[in-house]
Design a protein with these regions (language model features):
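Bacterial N-terminal signal peptides that target proteins for export
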Residues: 1-8
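N-terminal leader/targeting segments
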Residues: 3, 18-21
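Bacterial N-terminal signal peptides
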Residues: 8-15
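Membrane engagement elements in two modes
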Residues: 20-89, 99-101, 106, 110-121, ...
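Buried hydrophobic-core signal for structured, non-transmembrane domains
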Residues: 92-94
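Long, charge-dense
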Residues: 130-131
Protein backbone atom coordinates (compact mmCIF):
# COMPACT_ATOMS: atom_id res chain seq x y z
CA UNK A 1 0.00 0.00 0.00
CA UNK A 2 2.83 2.43 0.86
CA UNK A 3 4.43 1.75 -2.52
CA UNK A 4 1.19 2.63 -4.30
CA UNK A 5 0.96 5.88 -2.34
CA UNK A 6 4.55 6.78 -3.29
CA UNK A 7 3.82 6.09 -6.95
CA UNK A 8 0.63 8.16 -6.77
CA UNK A 9 2.53 11.03 -5.09
CA UNK A 10 5.23 10.88 -7.78
CA UNK A 11 2.65 10.98 -10.56
CA UNK A 12 0.90 13.91 -8.92
CA UNK A 13 4.21 15.79 -8.64
CA UNK A 14 4.91 15.17 -12.32
CA UNK A 15 1.49 16.48 -13.28
CA UNK A 16 2.36 19.84 -11.69
CA UNK A 17 5.36 20.23 -13.98
CA UNK A 18 4.67 21.76 -17.37
CA UNK A 19 4.69 18.88 -19.84
CA UNK A 20 5.57 21.07 -22.80
CA UNK A 21 3.85 23.29 -25.27
CA UNK A 22 0.45 22.42 -26.68
CA UNK A 23 -0.01 21.40 -30.31
CA UNK A 24 -0.20 25.08 -31.27
CA UNK A 25 3.31 25.70 -29.83
CA UNK A 26 1.96 27.74 -26.91
CA UNK A 27 2.46 27.11 -23.21
CA UNK A 28 -0.72 27.46 -21.13
CA UNK A 29 -0.98 28.64 -17.51
CA UNK A 30 -3.70 30.50 -15.65
CA UNK A 31 -5.91 32.37 -18.10
CA UNK A 32 -3.14 32.93 -20.65
CA UNK A 33 -0.85 31.26 -23.16
CA UNK A 34 2.81 32.16 -23.64
CA UNK A 35 4.95 31.79 -26.74
CA UNK A 36 8.58 32.20 -27.77
CA UNK A 37 7.58 32.26 -31.46
CA UNK A 38 9.38 35.58 -32.18
CA UNK A 39 12.77 34.00 -31.42
CA UNK A 40 15.97 34.83 -29.53
CA UNK A 41 14.98 32.67 -26.56
CA UNK A 42 13.10 29.50 -25.80
CA UNK A 43 10.69 28.53 -23.06
CA UNK A 44 11.54 25.46 -20.98
CA UNK A 45 8.40 25.34 -18.83
CA UNK A 46 5.40 27.35 -17.69
CA UNK A 47 3.47 26.61 -14.49
CA UNK A 48 1.12 28.32 -12.03
CA UNK A 49 -2.26 29.98 -11.98
CA UNK A 50 -1.28 33.65 -11.66
CA UNK A 51 -2.19 34.28 -8.04
CA UNK A 52 0.22 35.83 -5.55
CA UNK A 53 0.81 32.46 -3.85
CA UNK A 54 0.91 30.57 -7.16
CA UNK A 55 2.35 32.97 -9.76
CA UNK A 56 2.73 31.97 -13.37
CA UNK A 57 6.39 30.93 -13.58
CA UNK A 58 8.13 31.00 -16.95
CA UNK A 59 11.47 29.19 -17.12
CA UNK A 60 13.37 30.19 -20.23
CA UNK A 61 16.80 30.41 -21.85
CA UNK A 62 17.82 33.72 -23.39
CA UNK A 63 20.31 33.11 -26.21
CA UNK A 64 20.96 36.74 -27.08
CA UNK A 65 22.12 39.99 -25.54
CA UNK A 66 19.47 41.73 -27.68
CA UNK A 67 15.86 42.28 -26.62
CA UNK A 68 13.47 39.36 -27.10
CA UNK A 69 9.67 39.35 -27.07
CA UNK A 70 7.32 36.99 -25.25
CA UNK A 71 3.87 36.73 -26.87
CA UNK A 72 1.03 36.56 -24.30
CA UNK A 73 -2.52 35.68 -25.30
CA UNK A 74 -5.76 35.45 -23.33
CA UNK A 75 -6.47 31.72 -23.49
CA UNK A 76 -9.87 31.49 -21.86
CA UNK A 77 -12.46 33.69 -20.20
CA UNK A 78 -10.84 35.67 -17.41
CA UNK A 79 -11.40 34.14 -13.96
CA UNK A 80 -11.52 35.99 -10.67
CA UNK A 81 -8.54 35.28 -8.41
CA UNK A 82 -9.07 37.96 -5.80
CA UNK A 83 -7.75 40.77 -8.01
CA UNK A 84 -9.09 42.70 -11.01
CA UNK A 85 -10.03 40.87 -14.18
CA UNK A 86 -7.06 40.42 -16.48
CA UNK A 87 -4.40 40.66 -13.80
CA UNK A 88 -1.80 38.10 -12.86
CA UNK A 89 1.41 37.60 -10.95
CA UNK A 90 4.32 36.59 -13.16
CA UNK A 91 7.73 35.19 -12.29
CA UNK A 92 10.31 34.95 -15.08
CA UNK A 93 13.40 32.78 -14.51
CA UNK A 94 15.85 33.38 -17.34
CA UNK A 95 19.08 31.51 -18.00
CA UNK A 96 21.73 33.86 -19.40
CA UNK A 97 22.97 31.92 -22.43
CA UNK A 98 24.17 35.08 -24.22
CA UNK A 99 27.85 34.63 -23.31
CA UNK A 100 27.94 38.13 -21.78
CA UNK A 101 27.26 39.46 -18.28
CA UNK A 102 24.10 41.51 -17.75
CA UNK A 103 24.27 44.64 -15.59
CA UNK A 104 20.57 45.55 -15.84
CA UNK A 105 17.41 43.92 -17.12
CA UNK A 106 14.33 45.68 -18.45
CA UNK A 107 10.78 44.55 -19.21
CA UNK A 108 8.44 46.54 -21.44
CA UNK A 109 4.77 45.89 -22.16
CA UNK A 110 3.38 46.41 -25.66
CA UNK A 111 -0.23 46.14 -26.77
CA UNK A 112 0.87 46.51 -30.41
CA UNK A 113 4.12 44.78 -31.38
CA UNK A 114 6.91 47.35 -31.65
CA UNK A 115 4.89 50.16 -30.03
CA UNK A 116 5.37 50.77 -26.30
CA UNK A 117 2.26 50.53 -24.16
CA UNK A 118 1.03 53.92 -22.98
CA UNK A 119 -0.76 55.07 -19.85
CA UNK A 120 -4.24 54.76 -21.35
CA UNK A 121 -4.26 51.35 -23.08
CA UNK A 122 -5.19 49.27 -20.00
CA UNK A 123 -1.96 47.27 -19.99
CA UNK A 124 0.58 47.92 -17.23
CA UNK A 125 2.79 46.76 -14.41
CA UNK A 126 -0.08 47.69 -12.04
CA UNK A 127 0.14 51.46 -12.66
CA UNK A 128 -3.13 52.26 -10.88
CA UNK A 129 -1.96 50.82 -7.56
CA UNK A 130 1.78 50.08 -7.76
CA UNK A 131 2.94 47.90 -4.89
CA UNK A 132 6.73 47.56 -4.56
CA UNK A 133 6.19 44.39 -2.50
CA UNK A 134 5.00 42.66 -5.68
CA UNK A 135 8.21 43.44 -7.62
CA UNK A 136 11.31 41.34 -6.98
CA UNK A 137 14.59 40.03 -8.32
CA UNK A 138 17.17 37.70 -6.82
CA UNK A 139 20.08 39.39 -8.68
CA UNK A 140 19.22 43.11 -8.72
CA UNK A 141 18.87 45.30 -5.63
CA UNK A 142 16.56 47.96 -7.02
CA UNK A 143 13.99 48.60 -9.72
CA UNK A 144 12.46 51.57 -11.48
CA UNK A 145 8.97 51.54 -12.94
CA UNK A 146 7.98 54.00 -15.66
CA UNK A 147 4.38 54.49 -16.74
CA UNK A 148 4.74 57.47 -19.08
CA UNK A 149 5.24 57.40 -22.22
CA UNK A 150 5.59 53.63 -21.92
CA UNK A 151 5.21 50.80 -19.40
CA UNK A 152 8.72 49.68 -18.41
CA UNK A 153 10.20 48.00 -15.40
CA UNK A 154 14.00 48.21 -15.12
CA UNK A 155 16.05 46.17 -12.63
CA UNK A 156 19.48 47.58 -11.66
CA UNK A 157 22.26 47.44 -9.04
CA UNK A 158 23.34 43.88 -9.67
CA UNK A 159 24.67 41.57 -12.35
CA UNK A 160 24.03 38.24 -14.00
CA UNK A 161 26.96 36.10 -15.15
CA UNK A 162 26.72 33.83 -18.20
CA UNK A 163 24.72 30.66 -17.44
CA UNK A 164 23.31 32.21 -14.24
CA UNK A 165 19.51 32.10 -13.74
CA UNK A 166 18.07 35.37 -12.41
CA UNK A 167 14.43 35.47 -11.31
CA UNK A 168 12.10 38.45 -11.68
CA UNK A 169 8.65 38.81 -10.17
CA UNK A 170 5.97 41.41 -10.93
CA UNK A 171 2.25 41.98 -11.37
CA UNK A 172 0.66 42.66 -14.77
CA UNK A 173 -2.76 44.21 -15.23
CA UNK A 174 -4.43 43.59 -18.57
CA UNK A 175 -7.77 45.29 -19.11
CA UNK A 176 -7.11 45.87 -22.80
CA UNK A 177 -9.67 45.18 -25.48
CA UNK A 178 -7.16 42.94 -27.29
CA UNK A 179 -6.49 39.26 -26.64
CA UNK A 180 -2.78 39.39 -27.49
CA UNK A 181 0.02 41.53 -26.06
CA UNK A 182 3.78 41.41 -25.71
CA UNK A 183 6.45 41.46 -23.01
CA UNK A 184 9.82 42.67 -24.30
CA UNK A 185 12.76 41.40 -22.24
CA UNK A 186 15.94 43.45 -22.60
CA UNK A 187 19.18 42.38 -20.90
CA UNK A 188 21.67 45.22 -20.57
CA UNK A 189 25.33 44.38 -21.11
CA UNK A 190 28.36 46.52 -20.17
CA UNK A 191 29.93 48.44 -23.02
CA UNK A 192 33.29 50.12 -23.30
Amino acid sequence: MKRHLRILAALLALSLISAGPADDGRWYAGDYSFSDELGGFHILSVTGTGTKVDPIVINEVLNSESPVTLVIRAAKPIQHHGFPEGAFHLRVVTENNSGLAWIEFEFELQEILGKPSDFYDGLSFDQTNPNPDLISSNRFARFESHFEKFDRLRFANGHVDPLDRPAFGFFITDVTPVTEFYLVQDPRVPFS
